């Protein structure tokens, strides 16, 4: 699919030793474009808890799995193919070793994501045995740090440091592109940072500034793109507005910004929610399938939409037939407003149905419990986001869904930050965020929230049984509802 969607998949990341950014437009911008692609995940809440070119931009097409986004790279000499989860919420690239406990089992657990065999690469070099990543539910991987050659988006990075999982409970490798201060060896052992992927692109001259932009496109699209070192003005509406990233425990380590307002709109009424939880610190995390908001806000949204909420799993359900209705949730960040249509919030739940026979869809907003709120893919699909690590800023605009237009601008060095973006006047910064370290996915408190069942989850039934593996988990939950266990 990558060649089909190459026009949709350019992400600019240009890094130049922590300096500010200026607008550059030329025939061959310094960007690297990477395609990202979608892949189906049967239970996004459980999955979230598990994972919490001289052309100086580098772009990559992303696979859109409805709930997760993947990119294809090769590692080593000769290249070994890997499919990695794109994750802005962590900072290490890691993959499973071919002889790991997981990949060596009889279930072919690593067939889809691929694995890495150090002994088969002539450019492999051992670094340390400090790789030890864990996620909110206790899963993770333990192994070594190493360096090797990475081929990504038509560009080559030499001596890139990455993690190899020899003992692993996660079959999915990860392409972490967050702050270096969130790397495993920093958080686990207090060691110095190393140049992770975006930083290495700067150091090796592929891009000019440590920044990239992300365009996931809509739920129906198979692909999106990440553009290292630049922005693609054809992929968003209006203008980019720039906000400061908030410090976590006194340092810049995660993409946390201040959410100042949430509103509900339908054909019959408009409601702006008031809550003591606002303004709230929210983490922008492409590795989270769903969006996790403060409980009081979620309760209001669920009440207005009559969501059927099942507390033990932390999942809300709505009739799939609501897709296409004029219902929106709007998020405000001091000044910028990002509007998410109901179509982008209804995820396939297989054959799960309400008792009246209507198909049930997973609702893409769930309660955060006691943890920091997370704006995951059910938000990010509706936003074009520039992650400016060099200047500790986020630039954001409403996405231009299914755009075939490309206008790539290089992020250079200078005082003006992101190309064509304007600074938000007097942005809210009085929010407190607690860091969770390297993770992909849901807040740990999501399953024990006090949000009530606005509509009885017992209204759900199993519908017509299917044997498809991707629907098995949800079908079992549905049966559990029916039996009243």
From Swiss-Prot:
Pfam families (alphabetical): Asp
Domain Peptidase A1 residues, every copy: 69-397
Lipid attachment, kind GPI-anchor amidated serine: 461
GO CC terms in record: extracellular region; fungal-type cell wall; plasma membrane; side of membrane
Gene3D superfamilies: Acid Proteases (2.40.70.10)
GO molecular function: aspartic-type endopeptidase activity
Propeptide: 462-485
Glycosylation sites: 72, 99, 107, 111, 132, 328, 337, 402
EC number: 3.4.23.-
SUPFAM superfamilies per the UniProt record, alphabetical: Acid proteases
Active site: 87, 285
Similarity field: Belongs to the peptidase A1 family.
Described function: Probable GPI-anchored aspartic-type endopeptidase which contributes to virulence.
Protein name, as recorded: Probable aspartic-type endopeptidase opsB
Organism the protein comes from: Aspergillus fumigatus (strain ATCC MYA-4609 / CBS 101355 / FGSC A1100 / Af293) (Neosartorya fumigata)
Lineage start: Eukaryota, Fungi, Dikarya, Ascomycota, Pezizomycotina
Gene of this entry: opsB
